[in-house]
Amino acid sequence: MVIRVGTASWTDRTLIRDTDWYPERSMSAEDRLKYYASQFDVVEVDATYYYPPSQELVGLWTERTPADFRMDVKAFSLLTHHPARRDAVWDEVLAQVPAEHADRGSIYLSHLPEAAVDLAFAKFAEALLPLHSAGKLGGVFLQFPRWFTNRRDNRRYLDSLAERLPGYDVAVEFRHASWFSGDSGPKTLRQLEAQGLAYVCVDEPQGFDSSVPPVLATTTDLAVIRFHGHNAETWEASGISPAERFRYLYSDEELARWAPQVTELAATASETHAIFNNCYQDYGVRNAAQLLDLLD
């Protein structure tokens, strides 16, 4: 049973600009990652959601981290039914966009023929090979939007993920209550288990259509918990930065309640990743360090 604790970024602007967590404000990208990896043994790569990485960049991450380090890589927005900036999409994929969508500034998965969707997944998977070959790739993490509801076509899309990312540990987070409303929860978990997809447990504000309850469950050998905090005022707010949306510092009491639950979940998996996504200033790294102390 392995429990890893880390944060959802090591390059958040407010962490670098507004805190003294890193030894120096002007550290190089290499030194910053090396320092992070000296404090935690897992990180979620958030930048890959906005722009798919090159294999060369992934190779640098691989070289700059210890042998036992893990990176959970967030899937490119296009692959999770979010809009993707046109300039972030691979040229080979853009070439297959039908004429009626060719001039759009944002590209959606629904604009693409099936062959282009397959190509996009293949390009993303290819870029991650250095991490995977080194045994440092944790999960390929797909965070779906709140409009990705529990309906037949979306369930079919989930069924396609393992085939499109062969050999990788694929983890799924939902942002709509329909996946767990009524008797849907057990069905959702059974589907993920049948397809070999890891369920991402969440701690987040409740009471919204985009809220998913804090169900702790494992559907593969990899268990994942993401801590989003409880800032209800900003959870669905528009026009704000991720740092503001997840601006929440967990209290000692909250983390003390979570520690035994993390341990209990970890007993059902080979490896568990607890990721703090409260990426405002040093909130995430502070809470991650606190949880590590509680788990020791």
Could you say what each language-model-derived stretch is?
Residues M1-D296:
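Residues lining hydrophobic/aromatic ligand-binding pockets adjacent to catalytic sites
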